């Protein structure tokens, strides 16, 4: 029988529910249990694919092409699993499906209501996420906080699950903030008490509290919370601020969180062996070297827009016993005149993806600076496309060369819309999304990065591609197409072989990087940057 764990939040949002859920997932996986995890987002968008990065941070893409919340990146990195489209559910997605069924007459003339139709659809998503992965345990995080009007159908569905599958198969974990008032010199439990009261008013009694705090929590505070919130005192778990996120699973294990969960759900599983994870954390805390990487992006005011990129750089740094000193460079600020001033102290330059015209000329100048000064450079998605545009302009002398996306009237459309995208009108969910194979060119830097594999599978999110009409001219000038689709039609990786490291990929390698298993192309880039700093 599948076990269901529901993680809710109270007092404030962005409290770290996703990290707690991911950390618990890691502990349970290391007990030998098969774990999956999902995120409920109460917003009305179908998915975050068309949302501004300033509003939502990065869009995380799964193997099967779902555009999802960035928390799924935390889930995959912590638990080291590949999630699917059932791992992110939004209000918009649920209502869209229910309304589509109503139009088809599948409700046989019934009045369609929040209860039972919306709640049934939500419960079906929970069960489907578990069944498609054949999991022993599914962890479901509900975005936002208890009391948000948008969350009510989600919480009602969670309440009903207890009756549907039995109380012994369901556990509710509530995460809250425990504020410390310096003036009073004490922690205040009242916000948590009121949050739990609100949750209980909706029919959910939490079995465990996870309290986010900056300071150590005395046992007396835990006992008080246990008494007023009707949970066992040992089930009041402290989640204190840490230097590195990857410390959190170890901190939770030290408080027997996973054992309490297993006892409640009657899961007979051995103790979690966290030896490898602990060794990784110890290494992360004691890195001996540092290298500076300039990230040239258009959303640098919000680092969450590049969360997976940053994590992938860190992972590759760990593999090299090196801390990444990240320099955020706003692409709008980069010009041919000041590129050296902005980028001259960087050991490596990364140009990540993005959409729209703003900042693209600055990215092109950053790529030009890297090429002309032989600074290790990694381009991702739009960064790859602009790498091709930069080469066309400044090496092939194609004045005004551009991407058709950015300048439809350009004489040299180096990047063009994919053929199967031409007649698509909707923006959401219509990109080339998910896992696709990439055939590597033997002897190339890309092939060497991937240990001379013939084919790698990586995740994509794009609508435009390199225009093959220009391929022969590029190759004649020494531009190497080192990765292509198996049918040789779509360019996946480009590089300049004579440079220290000048490689750009159409796909998003960062989405498959893990702290104990860094992505190979990122590692090759970081290794080149480290060598460049010596």
Curated annotation (Swiss-Prot):
GO BP term, example: 'de novo' CTP biosynthetic process
Source organism per UniProt: Streptococcus pyogenes serotype M18 (strain MGAS8232)
Binding site for L-glutamine: 54, 354, 382-385, 405, 463
Gene: pyrG
Catalytic residues identified in the record: 381 (nucleophile), 508, 510
Note: CTPSs have evolved a hybrid strategy for distinguishing between UTP and CTP. The overlapping regions of the product feedback inhibitory and substrate sites recognize a common feature in both compounds, the triphosphate moiety. To differentiate isosteric substrate and product pyrimidine rings, an additional pocket far from the expected kinase/ligase catalytic site, specifically recognizes the cytosine and ribose portions of the product inhibitor.
A Pfam family of this chain: GATase
CDD domains hit by this protein: CTPS_N (cd03113), GATase1_CTP_Synthase (cd01746)
Protein name: CTP synthase
């Amino acid at each position: 029988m599948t076990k269901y764990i529901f993680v809710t939040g109270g007092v404030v949002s962005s409290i770290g529910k996703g990290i707690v859920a991911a950390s618990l997932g890691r502990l349970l996986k290391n007990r030998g249990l098969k774990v999956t995890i999902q995120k409920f987002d109460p917003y009305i968008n179908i998915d975050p694919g068309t949302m501004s990065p300033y509003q939502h941070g990065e869009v995380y893409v799964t193997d099967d092409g779902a555009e999802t919340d960035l928390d799924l990146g935390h889930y995959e990195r912590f638990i080291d699993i590949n999630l699917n489209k059932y791992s992110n559910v939004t209000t918009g997605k649920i209502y869209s499906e229910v309304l589509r069924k109503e139009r088809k007459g599948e409700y046989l003339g019934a009045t369609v209501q929040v209860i039972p139709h919306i709640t049934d659809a939500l419960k079906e998503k929970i069960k489907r996420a578990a069944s498609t992965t054949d999991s022993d345990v599914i962890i479901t995080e509900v975005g936002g906080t208890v009391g948000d009007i948008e969350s009510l159908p989600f919480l009602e569905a969670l309440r009903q699950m207890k009756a549907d599958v039995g109380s012994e198969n369901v556990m509710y974990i509530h995460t809250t903030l425990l504020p410390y008032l310096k003036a009073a010199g004490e922690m205040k439990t009242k916000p948590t008490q009121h949050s739990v009261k609100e949750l209980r008013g909706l029919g959910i009694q939490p079995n465990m509290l996870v309290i986010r705090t900056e300071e150590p929590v005395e046992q007396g505070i835990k006992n008080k919370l246990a008494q007023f919130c009707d949970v066992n005192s040992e089930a009041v778990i402290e989640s204190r601020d840490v230097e590195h996120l990857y410390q959190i699973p170890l901190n939770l294990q030290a408080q027997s969180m996973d054992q309490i969960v297993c006892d409640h759900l009657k899961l007979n599983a051995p103790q979690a062996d966290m030896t490898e994870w602990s060794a990784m954390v110890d290494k992360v805390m004691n890195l001996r070297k540092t290298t500076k990487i300039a990230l040239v992006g258009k959303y640098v005011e919000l680092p969450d827009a590049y969360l997976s990129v940053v994590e992938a750089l860190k992972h590759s740094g760990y593999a090299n016993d090196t801390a990444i000193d990240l320099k955020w460079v706003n692409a709008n600020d980069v010009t041919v005149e000041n590129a050296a001033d902005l980028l001259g102290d960087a050991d490596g330059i990364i140009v990540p993806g993005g959409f729209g015209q703003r900042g693209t000329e600055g990215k092109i100048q950053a790529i030009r600076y890297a090429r002309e000064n032989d600074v290790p450079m990694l381009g991702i998605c739009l960064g790859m496309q602009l790498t091709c545009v930069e080469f066309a302009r400044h090496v092939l002398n194609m004045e005004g060369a551009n991407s058709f996306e950015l300048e439809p009237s350009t004489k040299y459309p180096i990047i063009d819309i994919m053929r199967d995208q031409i007649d698509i009108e909707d923006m959401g969910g219509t990109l080339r999304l998910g896992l696709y194979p990439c055939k590597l060119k033997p002897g190339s830097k890309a092939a060497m990065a991937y240990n001379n594999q013939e084919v790698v599978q990586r995740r994509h999110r794009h609508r435009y591609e390199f225009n093959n009409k220009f391929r022969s001219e590029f190759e004649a000038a020494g531009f190497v197409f080192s990765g292509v689709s198996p049918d040789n039609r779509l360019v996946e990786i480009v590089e300049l072989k004579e440079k220290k490291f000048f490689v750009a990929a159409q796909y998003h390698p960062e989405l498959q990087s893990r702290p104990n298993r860094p992505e190979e192309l990122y590692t090759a880039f970081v290794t080149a940057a480290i060598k460049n700093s010596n």
